[in-house]
Amino acid sequence: MANGGGGGGGGSSGSSGGGGGGGGGETALRMSSNIHANHLSLDASSSSSSSSSSSSSSSSSVHEPKMDALIIPVTMEVPCDSRGQRMWWAFLASSMVTFFGGLFIILLWRTLKYLWTVCCHCGGKTKEAQKINNGSSQADGTLKPVDEKEEVVAAEVGWMTSVKDWAGVMISAQTLTGRVLVVLVFALSIGALVIYFIDSSNPIESCQNFYKDFTLQIDMAFNVFFLLYFGLRFIAANDKLWFWLEVNSVVDFFTVPPVFVSVYLNRSWLGLRFLRALRLIQFSEILQFLNILKTSNSIKLVNLLSIFISTWLTAAGFIHLVENSGDPWENFQNNQALTYWECVYLLMVTMSTVGYGDVYAKTTLGRLFMVFFILGGLAMFASYVPEIIELIGNRKKYGGSYSAVSGRKHIVVCGHITLESVSNFLKDFLHKDRDDVNVEIVFLHNISPNLELEALFKRHFTQVEFYQGSVLNPHDLARVKIESADACLILANKYCADPDAEDASNIMRVISIKNYHPKIRIITQMLQYHNKAHLLNIPSWNWKEGDDAICLAELKLGFIAQSCLAQGLSTMLANLFSMRSFIKIEEDTWQKYYLEGVSNEMYTEYLSSAFVGLSFPTVCELCFVKLKLLMIAIEYKSANRESRSRKRILINPGNHLKIQEGTLGFFIASDAKEVKRAFFYCKACHDDVTDPKRIKKCGCRRLEDEQPPTLSPKKKQRNGGMRNSPNTSPKLMRHDPLLIPGNDQIDNMDSNVKKYDSTGMFHWCAPKEIEKVILTRSEAAMTVLSGHVVVCIFGDVSSALIGLRNLVMPLRASNFHYHELKHIVFVGSIEYLKREWETLHNFPKVSILPGTPLSRADLRAVNINLCDMCVILSANQNNIDDTSLQDKECILASLNIKSMQFDDSIGVLQANSQGFTPPGMDRSSPDNSPVHGMLRQPSITTGVNIPIITELAKPGKLPLVSVNQEKNSGTHILMITELVNDTNVQFLDQDDDDDPDTELYLTQPFACGTAFAVSVLDSLMSATYFNDNILTLIRTLVTGGATPELEALIAEENALRGGYSTPQTLANRDRCRVAQLALLDGPFADLGDGGCYGDLFCKALKTYNMLCFGIYRLRDAHLSTPSQCTKRYVITNPPYEFELVPTDLIFCLMQFDHNAGQSRASLSHSSHSSQSSSKKSSSVHSIPSTANRPNRPKSRESRDKQKKEMVYR
């Protein structure tokens, strides 16, 4: 028996048995050593354990050579078939019978159903024919049994439908139960696949006891669940045949039945369990059910990966099965021992066509499978792998989410994100003069940044983050935490070809952001003024809560209009809200003084309690002399603190105003630290301090801070130019009641005549037809125009509108008297001007000369050499792709005008005897007379009275140029040219030495105020964020008084509405305006020759309530030798000790003059009531020289006390 034990069959004590056993051992040796070697000894011990077992083995061994079957391992714990016969066919048969049996039943059912339907159809036709033949002879009762049958059938159909619907709900991913079941089935399928990976290390077929094998028990439980889920799917399926042929169904057929067979036979066959890997194909669907995958790229990536991996693992399982089993027709003798993971490796090198040859298929089935697999696998590898790599490589590098930092604000910047727009924004937003900007900037754009922009982000990585996405997508808004952002800033493309489309895009961005979070503060750039009205249609848009729209066209044309009133003002204001560092120049050149002024910016600060009770001019003087600060305005808020609409910005309000607690002041200073002196100033501690740098927080201030505040702060805290302070509303006290026009004005007021718009902010006239204001060239030539504004406009019928109303409105502000209004003459295409006329027909003194600004005949016809200002605009700039050619029309027009030569203009004036008054022009006014426009010598130049850089010589003064010299050459015509491309500024002045790479603000044309580019307005975005009052102040200065209420009115009617002159509307005229003060003559002439700017500042403020804030100086005034150059440059906020020269023009804010509206022909003295005495101001001829006023009181207090009447000349 021991000798016979060498066979795998158990052997016997006889020779034949031993021989049989030997044959069995020989077969066992041909099989894999790792499968059978350890089981041979176990078989021997099993045969010697009992006699009954030995006799049974002996009898079985006799028949084994006849069966010629392979021997499988037999353990002593498992009561297995001692003959060692393979039973793989039983496992496979169970699957095949299930699949084909079910398929046969489905086909049989369909066939019977089809036959039954055909038969019923024929029978139905027969019954119908019988029913027609019988007609009405049959009683109604004969049809009741049929109805009852139909009700029974309907009931049955309803029951089956209910069950089917219930099953569909159970497996549908639309319900929570369905999603749970789908996810659970997928998870259990992966679990079954893991069990297969574990069992793959065992033999392909082995005897196992179900009650002792833990993995088999788990696999059995999984498959029971799969069977139940299969039943639900079968019930819910509409087409049973297609369901039976689905991949998931085939997987169940070849994995579920073999498990039950293995329990019955007490043996396990690895078989086709690897098909569970096909369930991985549904991985992307599972992730979508769980809302993990939301983007198309991520879904596609997971789909490709799941299909590739599942195919790979499934094919490896098949190779593992056939290679470890062998070919059936070879009696399973050509097998080889390969682990599953070696098969995975073999399939990978096969798909990739590498084929190292270290592992290969030996069986015919394996090789045949490899032949077909390499075709499909190679195609899949060649297409799927590159696409997977591309998707992974193209995954959004900036697709994460923003993580808010505790204690640190963040803003979201979106819209037009380019290298230029971002660099300009960051340069101003993160400027060192803003104190410590503890704000993180999050950029959101749907296009990934290029290398240059990416490098810019990396340089500012501590404060800047970029995320790829769109604000129109709520998911992307959630990624950047828009709900917790301090504000959202939307940048516009200033150079786009279609401004209306760009505005529409930004409006859609505002709608999307406001829809996601209505309370977010939004600051957006708009290109066209008329598109601002669409923002008012957004329900959550609220300018009272900080929402602002920066209209570039409105501000650009407003700046240019102010330059028509005081040339150089556009440059000064643009420099004030732009953050620029101080550049020190040692040489005594004009750049030295210009750059000293450029370093000044606009800031706000709450005034110290030491200023309480003082008048505005007194506080202004104290701040300028002692604190070295220039205060130009304060914030006024009515007693109703809950309403922000009652808040106003008062610019140089005059001496009637008394400051109380919590007044917010607007200052011009070089940095934010200097402005804090106004808050820290204490009369008790700092009264004797001469160095303003020593004015810091004192002990008195600390005691005040320790006291509990009486009013809670309400103003929103922002970093940068503003600081937090108790926000008590500044209560303003007037010595006099609300200013009302004098009795003589009220008596002469014609209530039936509308001279102003309904708000009283602008001059108004009845709408005029464009034909009434058109001048022909001959009519214009016969009309002697002088002191007017010539607007050269390039545009055609297809050009985008630039909004000329924004240019005209500041020139028609009601704080000018009618006779002070400059006549405006447009020179350009009549087709274009017709499109703009709808917004211009309510303004007086406007004429049109159809033509082209490049025609010298047209320019001579409008007397361009006698104009106060020539404005060159173009509506065609953004239609050209080449940026260097965008400004070609404006540059050509500018050079054309400068090259013109003019004869003696006095001869031209003689044509006035044969001329006529142009439409809207009142020739009866002395200011409109040709001689007045030519030879006037004003000491103060205001809206209509700015000379063409002409100072007439007087004894003791150095005349730089004469009248005829100025008029003979076009180079002396004052003009301002709008540019799109900053670098094109180099072409405006042929005699300057500006480098092409010089920044715009450092170039001579910009410093002189003869060029303006819209790019300078980019700084307003960050300035508005840090202090929303800055935008209000700038708009008040440049628009002539436009308010949100007026914008709402224009949005309704797209035109100004005329209003009657009432005391309330006339009171709105009482507001400050910009003027230029000449030092050649007048009361300040003594200071013009070597005097100090500080003395001029104090004298103008005390005497005339005029607030000086800058100088417009000749470029070569610092030279000791005379120069013929008449170019001037801007000096902003010079220091107290700054030396003046006689040719300087002083920028000042002057009060409204109520008496200038009376007849200018009379030079007699006039007196007014006390209401107007506090509002005395000066116009062109209103300030006499000091020598002519011997009775003038010595002190301002005595003048106020005596209420002495002003003398007008």
Swiss-Prot record:
Indicate which residues the UniProt annotation says bind Mg(2+): 440, 463, 465
Q: Ranges of Basic and acidic residues compositional bias?
A: 1194-1209
What is the activity regulation entry? Ethanol and carbon monoxide-bound heme increase channel activation.
Q: Where is this region: Segment S8?
A: 614-634
Describe its assembly: Homotetramer; which constitutes the calcium-activated potassium channel. Interacts with beta subunits KCNMB1, KCNMB2, KCNMB3 and KCNMB4. Interacts with gamma subunits LRRC26, LRRC38, LRRC52 and LRRC55. Beta and gamma subunits are accessory, and modulate its activity. Interacts with RAB11B.
Q: Which family does it belong to?
A: Belongs to the potassium channel family. Calcium-activated (TC 1.A.1.3) subfamily. KCa1.1/KCNMA1 sub-subfamily.
Task: Please give the name of this protein.
Answer: Calcium-activated potassium channel subunit alpha-1
Q: Which gene encodes it?
A: Kcnma1
